[in-house]
A protein has these predicted regions:
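A sequence-level detector for low-complexity, Ser/Thr- and acidic-rich stretches
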Residues: 38, 157-179, 281-439, 443, ...
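N-terminal cationic leader/targeting segments used for protein routing and processing
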Residues: 3-4, 103, 238, 439, ...
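Metal-centered catalytic cores of metalloenzymes
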Residues: 23-76, 80-207, 211-284
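Extended amphipathic alpha-helical heptad-repeat regions
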Residues: 434-481
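Processing junctions and N-termini across compartments
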Residues: 17, 315, 457-458
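Sec-dependent, cleavable N-terminal signal peptides
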Residues: 1-25, 483
Length: 483
């Protein structure tokens, strides 16, 4: 029970720390035991520590819990040293007096502590917490501080490029835009990066990470390559890029504190057609809308299935958007759309991306591993990084096909609330339109309104809350009417 209690205590303390933290933070975790001491000792004490480190201010909050530690705590510190190596003290916490004791368990929370060591050493997992007692003055238990991957984001615009090159004639001559999401592990210096570029008809001649503040042209620190490298894929005027396990060539501190940007060069704009400052995500743990979907009839011509959603805040979101038809027959749906196509538009009506037939995803690709990708080769799917804004996804029938289709949008992030609003409809189609979702949402039936005057002969809309396809319904379902 002691370990369970410590886990709950650490979780609660972590939430309190994160809730007040700035964006430029890196989380560190440490498993504390005697086996990491040099030399090791027979102490049975074990524990955990969580640090929230603000890279910009060089300050941190730390929560610690150690059990089976009956001896008086003589002192505690952060030392600089790699795993298996003893190093000098850089930050002092104090002894027993600054901890709370409950039997043989010690706990403490330290806030706003200035780190006495070097930023880069800490970020590269080169520091550890050490707890000393009279029995083991060199340290009874210690734990290496391991950096957790940090989420970074970037929104690409022409305006950011224009600010760095005032004499250039970018604005009005290109409408390129896009976004990127990435994780950076400072301990291993590895970046996992995903890019989406839209309205980019020109040839992508090169792309890089640069170091520089907003509005400043800086040096290249990491080359990503031209649009011809295998990491990029073009479909019309949209380009997607995936770079996994990339060793970062720049300064980790600058990357984590807004001092780097992504730049995309073209044959028309050699200095860069659009760019985006890389910033640390401000995302906090919270409820996530995992999936929203709309099921309805798709006819010919203008009889399409429409889904709308809105991404709020300042950060882009990586999403899987799919159009399914043939696979619905597995769940007993009849008259399915045999060959659905999928197109995404932004709030200005600009076409961003399109897919007709996902085919058979190649082994090892993301489409082959992500849950929710269509199982029929004739269905459609797009994995995109979308900047904040309003979006519309449209499902149509290829080759004059018609029938029932399912439009789904899935958030591929962890711990995020992003879909603040969504709308669905089917133009020119009679019958029901089904909107589906996963996770906690509320439907206020009294707030449902016709966008314009209700068409003559149309029945009043009715809202029913049910269960997904293939799931047995509970004994009772909530049902409400909107009048």
């Amino acid at each position: 029970m002691k370990n369970i209690s410590r886990s709950f205590w650490l979780s609660g303390a972590l939430f309190a720390l994160v809730a007040s933290a700035s964006a430029q933070i890196v989380e560190f975790r440490a498993t504390i035991n005697a086996a990491q001491e040099v030399p090791t000792n027979p102490s049975a004490a074990t524990g955990s520590a969580i640090m929230i480190y603000d890279v910009a201010s060089n300050t941190f909050d730390l929560v610690v819990s150690i059990s089976n530690f009956p001896a008086t705590l003589a002192s505690s510190h952060i030392h600089e040293g790699a795993s298996g190596v003893n190093g000098p003290v850089v930050t002092n916490f104090g002894g027993e007096a600054v901890y709370t004791r409950n039997g043989s368990t010690l706990t403490a929370t330290f806030r706003g502590v200035t780190h006495g060591g070097t930023k880069l050493t800490l970020l590269k997992n080169g520091a550890y917490v050490n707890f000393h007692s009279s029995a083991f003055p060199g340290g009874e238990v210690r734990g290496q501080l391991i950096a957790q991957p940090k989420r970074l984001v970037a929104n690409f615009t022409v305006a950011q490029e224009q600010a760095a090159f005032p004499a250039a004639t970018l604005t009005g001559n290109t409408n390129a835009f896009g976004a990127a999401v990435m994780t950076y592990d400072s301990g291993t210096n590895v970046v996992n990066l995903r890019i989406s570029l839209y309205n980019f008809p020109n040839t992508l001649t090169n792309s890089h990470f640069h170091e520089g503040a907003p509005g400043v042209s800086g040096a290249v620190v990491q080359n990503l390559g031209a649009g011809t490298v295998v990491n990029y894929a073009r479909d019309g005027n949209s380009i997607t890029g995936t770079f996994l396990n990339l060793t970062y060539g720049g300064d980790p501190v600058k990357l984590l504190t807004g001092g780097a940007y992504l730049n995309f060069h073209s044959n028309v704009f050699a200095g860069g057609e659009c760019r985006g400052q890389v910033i640390a995500s401000e995302e906090l743990p919270g409820t996530r809308v995992a999936n929203v979907s709309t099921r309805g009839f798709v006819g010919t011509g203008s009889q399409v299935l429409i889904g709308g959603f809105n991404i709020t805040g300042s950060e882009p979101v990586r999403m899987l958007i799919t159009a399914k038809g043939p696979s619905l027959s597995t769940y007993g749906v009849t008259g399915v759309l045999a060959n659905p196509t999928l197109t995404i538009f932004d709030g200005s009506g600009r076409q961003m991306a399109q897919n007709d037939d996902v085919g058979t995803p190649a082994a090892g690709t993301e489409l082959a591993t992500i849950y929710g990708v269509p199982t029929s080769t004739l269905e459609s799917a797009l994995i995109v990084v979308l900047p904040p804004g309003n979006y519309t996804a449209i499902v149509a029938g290829s080759g004059g096909t018609f029938g029932i289709a399912l439009l789904e949008a899935t958030d591929l992030r962890n711990n995020a609330t992003i879909l603040s609003n969504r709308a669905a409809g089917a133009t020119g189609a009679e019958g029901d339109v089904l909107a589906e979702f996963k996770r906690d949402l509320r439907a206020a039936a009294t707030n449902l309104r016709w966008a314009a005057a209700k068409p003559t002969g149309r029945p009043e809309p009715e809202l029913c809350v049910g269960v997904p396809l293939g799931v047995q319904a509970p004994a009772a379902l909530a049902q409400a009417q909107a009048r």
